[in-house]
Amino acid sequence: PKNGNSVVSTIDMQIQKIIEQKLKDFDDKIGSKVTNILVMNPQNGEILGMASSYPYNLNKPMDEKSLLSLYSQSEIDKMKAYTKQKQAEEATDSEDTSEDSKDSTKKKTDDQKTIYDAFNELWRNSIISDTNEPGSTYKPFTVATGLESGALTGNENYFCTGSLMVGKRNIGCSHVHGNITLKDAVAKSCNVAMMNIGFKEGADTFYKYQNIFGFGRSTGIDLPGETDTKSLVYNASNYSNSVTLATNAFGQN
């Protein structure tokens, strides 16, 4: 017999403890539909801490008390009743294969959930299973694209009036930055500068480096449920639309 492979976690318990407390503090004071915190080692991608809203006990994954962070007790009771009803219908349908019985199983509406649907929602790791626009965190990639491709020298200056007319759309910035250097455009998160940089790079280069940086590709994290993002990344023809290129340059669409 051979020993199995060693399993070593990269989680830093001190970091994990801190982010779980910070997440709880935020949800208690402000709250959101879902709150996520992820801490990575930027040198090698190791996960040092990962926490999401709606914790549950892995030793008791189907403890109904955990669902109270998502639903009221009355909602849970309704789902349990609906689950029993659905199970009874399915048991009947397994004995009766007529067309009428098949149609009876199609009456589930979007707002009806079984208790198992609720648990699946609770167990879902939204950090790896959900997608979000990167927003301003994409701006360094826009600048890096320009520097790597030679579209930028690093000595550029821009003028931000608080918005930029692109086609028939006036696309805004959070502030009127006035004259701004490339370095400050990143530091102050200037949308106007990023749009101008995107235009300077052009659709083909912008798309090329989006792929080089790994957007739309699987991370290969050793956790189940990572979402497929290939269809969320535009191709060069999409970026031929000036508004699309402009907004994607600062991480939105």
Residue ranges and their predicted role:
Residues P1-T35, Q43:
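Conserved, well-ordered alpha-helix/loop/beta-strand core segments that scaffold catalytic motifs
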Residues I11, Q43-S136, F141-N253:
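Beta-lactam-recognizing serine transpeptidase/beta-lactamase-like catalytic domain environment
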Residues I19, L38, L48-M50:
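Mobile, glycine-rich extracellular loop/lid and propeptide segments
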